Curated annotation (Swiss-Prot):
It is an enzyme of class 1 (oxidoreductase). PANTHER family: IODOTYROSINE DEIODINASE 1 (PTHR23026:SF90), NADPH NITROREDUCTASE (PTHR23026). One of its GO terms (molecular function) is oxidoreductase activity. It comes from the Archaea. This is Putative NADH dehydrogenase/NAD(P)H nitroreductase AF_2267. Its EC number is 1.-.-.-.
Length: 174
């Protein structure tokens, strides 16, 4: 199997982390991958906040129903958007930031780092909580948070059950 596909097929939401810290160099590699995501009209509307402070990660976890992994994460990346950068009258930044978030997940997997995508947008209470905690300006939309850490057990990277479903594929028309 090609190495790239292996990384995709074995990417999981990893919620239990070891104490090993992620290097600044690897965080930068992950952010570079995020910034190489496709964006409508090449507008690249994203901004990223890297959070490593353990107390802040704990506070951030309280904004989520399922954010319990954040206090033990090595880092979190908050993906934000500046909708004013849009060249179009519709919100293409949502797709752009989704692509950037997925690139973060895949780059982390390629580096042996576990990750979890925590949805923020369009949940107003989550956006408000993170905006207040992190000093994010009102004109910036908080899109997602990605929790990052080395898995406590390397076996967490396993190939999932085959989710391929030919019934969901339509050729030429529905």
């Amino acid at each position: 199997m090609e190495e790239c596909l292996k990384m995709i097929y074995t990417r999981r939401s990893i919620r239990v982390y070891s104490d090993r810290q992620i290097s600044d160099e690897d965080i930068e590699k992950i952010l570079k991958a995020a910034m190489l995501a496709p964006s409508a009209g090449n507008e690249q509307p994203w901004h990223f906040i890297v959070v490593r402070d353990r107390e802040m990660l704990k506070k951030m976890s309280e904004a989520f129903t399922f954010g319990q992994m954040l206090p033990n994460a090595s880092a979190a990346i908050v993906v934000c958007a500046d909708p004013k950068l849009s060249k179009y009258p519709y919100d293409m930044w949502v797709q752009d930031c989704s692509a950037a978030t997925e690139n973060i997940l895949l780059a982390a997997r390629c580096l042996g780092i576990g990750s979890v995508w925590l949805g923020v947008y369009p949940r107003e209470e989550r956006m408000k909580a993170l905006r207040e905690l992190l000093g994010i300006p009102e004109n910036i939309v908080v899109f997602s948070v990605v929790s990052l850490g080395y898995p406590k057990d390397e076996k967490d990277f396993y190939e999932a059950d085959d989710r391929f479903n030919p019934d969901r594929i339509h050729r030429e028309k529905w």
